[in-house]
Regions:
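Extracellular/periplasmic helix-loop-helix junction of adjacent transmembrane segments
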Residues: 1-29
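Membrane-interface helix termini in secondary transporters
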Residues: 3, 34-39, 121, 125
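Conserved MFS/SLC helix-loop-helix module at the cytosolic interface between two early adjacent transmembrane helices
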Residues: 28-71
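Hydrophobic core of transmembrane alpha-helices in multi-pass small-molecule transporters
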Residues: 57-58, 69-83, 91, 218
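Small-residue-rich segments within alpha-helical transmembrane domains of MFS-like 12-TM solute carriers
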Residues: 62, 66, 78-86, 95, ...
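Short hydrophobic/alpha-helical segments at membrane-entry points of transmembrane helices
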Residues: 66-74, 86, 137-138, 211-213
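Pair of pore-lining "gating" transmembrane helices in MFS-fold secondary transporters
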Residues: 75, 202, 206-218
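Central mid-sequence intracellular linker of multi-pass
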Residues: 97-114, 121, 127-201
Length: 218
């Protein structure tokens, strides 16, 4: 990030530690996060809560005074973001059949790079025009702007996010809607979301094609 390296006199691997802290937390907390996501009582509230916390930590990064604070906050960002990717598709898969799911999952995947592309231009403009405003460096303003975008959307999630069919019913769904959703699971032979125990992850790790995807990502 422009200006951050110079402000903290970062050298060598110090820049790599930003990603290392984030990735370490992402790896460690993804499985525990998904275990929580599989609980119907938590499924509706967990993702919005994680996004609110992500936004708060993003704001906090704008106020760091040394690089070690930034490392700690990057670790927290990775922790809060860890179950979001898999959790989103877990939630989608609990409501839609295969024929319906690929459109929604595809839209989600398309929006990710589009969002990154647009945010890149916005961040460049913000850095150029806000650098020095309020006595703060441009890179600090980028964290503030990211937080401003994130927190209102995350708070909206408490109202509109449905969780899984067995979660507490949101206001916009009737009892009949919930019954229909559950009957669709049986009609399309969609396995009803259950708790993700450690035995599930053990079975997953024993399947060869999972490791093929791991090496593809590497």
């Amino acid at each position: 990030m422009s200006g951050l390296k110079e402000d903290f006199n970062l050298n060598g691997n110090e820049l790599n530690y930003f990603n290392a802290c984030y990735t370490a937390a992402y790896v460690v907390f993804q499985v525990p996060g998904m275990l929580l996501m599989s609980r119907p009582q938590l499924a509706r509230w967990l993702l919005p809560t994680l996004e609110v916390l992500w936004g708060v930590v993003t704001f906090a990064q704008s106020r760091v005074t040394d690089v070690h604070q930034l490392y700690a906050l990057r670790f927290l960002v990775g922790m809060f973001e860890a179950p979001v990717f898999a959790g989103t598709h877990f939630i989608l898969g609990s409501w839609y059949s295969g024929a319906e799911l690929y459109r929604r999952a595809g839209t989600w995947f398309i929006c990710n790079p589009l969002g990154s592309m647009i945010s890149g231009y916005l961040q460049a403009a913000a850095y150029k025009n806000l650098s020095g405003a309020g006595g703060m460096a441009g890179w600090r303003w980028l964290f503030i702007i990211d937080g401003i975008f994130t927190i209102p959307v995350a708070l909206l999630g408490y109202v509109v996010f449905p969780g899984i069919p067995d979660s507490p019913r949101p206001f916009y769904l009737t009892e009949d809607d919930t019954k229909l959703a559950k009957s669709r699971l049986e009609k399309f032979r969609i396995r009803r979301p259950g708790r993700l125990g450690l035995d599930v992850f053990k079975r997953t790790l024993s399947r060869w094609h999972i490791w093929v995807f791991v090496f593809c990502y590497m």
